[in-house]
C-alpha cells in the first residue's frame, strides 16, 4: 500500500504533522511495484485501465464525514479525501468534470471480486489480510486512533491502561478501530459490533456502549458536531495504520496513481491539504492502552 519515493517529503511531513498523521509509511502493494514513467501515465495511456473510458470513477461511502468530506458531498472538492482525489485526478490528466463519484459501502469495499470503480477513497486502512483480496495504493495519510465517550462517563476521567479494559466498547465491523479495541485495549467485555459507524454512534448516545474508537479526525468531528454531549477523550499512540486508495486486485492503474501520490508529496500538496483540514488534531493528548 505504501512506498515513499522522496525522502525529503518524508522529513517535511514527519516533522510538520507527526502527531496527527503523515504520509510516510510504506506497505507492499499487491500490484506491480515497478515505477511508472510519466509517458506511460499520460491520460491517453491509462484509458485502457479505466472502469469507464474517459472518466475517473471514484468510490466512497454514504454518508461521509468531515474532515474527509464536507456536507456529505464528495464532488465539491472540499475535505481532505475529496481534495486528494481531485489532486490525483489532475495528476492523471482529468478535469474536475471528468471525475465521477459512486457509492461503495465500507464493509464491501475490500471484498474479493470485480469493482465498479477505478479506486475507492474512504479511510480504508491497509492490512495484509485485505491486500489478499484487493490492491492498495501507497499511503496518502497515516493516522492515530482515538476514543470517544459521553460527557460524565467514567471513561472521560479514568482512562489508564487498566481503566480502559473495564469499559464496554462498540464499533463498526471491519474497522481499524474495532481491531484496536480487541488487540490493543483488550477489554474484559466483548465489544459490540455494528454494521455502520452511525449505528455505533447511536448506541453510544443511547448508553448501550460506553465508548468507541475511530481515527482522530473522525472522532473529533463526531464529538464536536455529530454527537450530543460527546468528547474526544484522547488519542492512542500510532500503530502503523495508514490509508491507501483501494483498487480491484492487480489493477495496473495503481502504478500511475502511486506516481501521482509521489508527485503530490514532493510538491507539497499533500502536506498543504493536511495543514488545511487536519492540523487541529495535534492538540489532543495521547494515552497508552
Task: Report each predicted region and the residues it spans.
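Periplasmic-binding protein-like
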Residues: 62, 142-149, 216-262, 280-289
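Extracytoplasmic small-molecule ligand-binding "clamshell" domains
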Residues: 36-120
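Extended ligand-binding regions for polar small-molecule ligands
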Residues: 82, 91, 153, 168, ...
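Short helix-initiation/N-cap motifs at beta->coil->alpha
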Residues: 99-111, 155-156, 192-202, 206, ...
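A ligand-binding cleft/hinge motif common to bilobed small-molecule-binding domains
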Residues: 108, 124-133, 182, 205-206, ...
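Ligand-binding clefts/hinges and TM-proximal coupling segments of bilobed small-molecule sensing domains
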Residues: 22, 37-48, 176-192, 232, ...
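Acidic, polar ligand-binding/catalytic clefts
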Residues: 97-161
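Bacterial lipoprotein signal-peptidase II cleavage site
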Residues: 19-30
Amino acid at each position: 500500500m505504501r512506498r515513499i519515493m522522496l525522502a525529503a517529503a518524508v522529513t517535511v511531513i514527519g516533522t510538520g504533522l507527526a502527531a496527527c498523521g503523515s504520509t510516510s509509511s510504506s506497505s507492499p502493494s499487491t500490484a506491480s511495484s515497478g515505477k511508472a514513467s510519466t509517458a506511460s501515465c499520460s491520460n491517453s495511456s491509462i484509458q485502457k485501465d479505466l472502469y469507464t473510458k474517459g472518466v475517473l470513477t471514484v468510490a466512497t461511502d454514504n454518508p461521509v464525514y468531515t474532515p474527509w468530506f464536507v456536507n456529505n458531498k464528495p464532488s465539491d472538492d472540499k475535505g481532505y479525501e475529496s481534495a486528494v482525489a481531485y489532486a490525483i485526478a489532475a495528476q492523471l490528466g482529468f478535469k474536475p468534470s471528468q471525475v465521477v463519484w459512486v457509492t461503495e459501502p465500507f464493509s464491501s469495499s475490500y471484498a474479493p471480486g470485480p469493482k465498479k470503480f477505478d479506486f475507492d477513497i474512504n479511510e480504508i486502512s491497509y492490512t495484509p489480510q485485505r491486500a489478499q483480496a484487493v490492491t492498495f495504493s501507497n499511503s496518502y495519510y497515516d493516522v492515530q486512533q482515538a476514543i470517544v465517550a459521553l460527557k460524565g462517563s467514567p471513561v472521560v476521567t479514568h482512562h489508564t491502561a487498566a481503566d480502559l479494559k473495564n469499559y464496554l466498547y462498540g464499533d463498526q465491523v471491519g474497522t481499524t478501530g474495532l481491531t484496536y479495541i480487541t488487540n490493543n485495549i483488550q477489554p474484559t467485555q466483548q465489544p459490540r459490533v455494528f454494521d455502520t459507524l452511525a449505528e455505533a454512534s447511536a448506541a453510544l448516545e443511547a448508553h448501550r456502549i460506553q465508548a468507541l474508537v475511530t481515527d482522530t479526525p473522525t472522532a473529533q468531528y463526531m464529538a464536536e458536531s455529530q454527537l450530543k454531549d460527546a468528547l474526544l477523550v484522547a488519542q492512542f499512540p500510532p500503530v502503523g495504520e495508514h490509508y491507501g486508495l483501494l483498487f480491484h486486485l492487480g489493477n495496473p492503474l495503481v502504478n500511475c496513481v502511486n506516481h501521482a501520490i509521489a508527485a503530490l508529496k514532493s510538491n507539497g500538496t499533500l502536506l498543504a491539504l493536511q495543514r488545511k483540514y487536519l492540523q487541529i488534531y495535534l492538540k489532543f493528548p495521547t494515552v497508552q492502552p
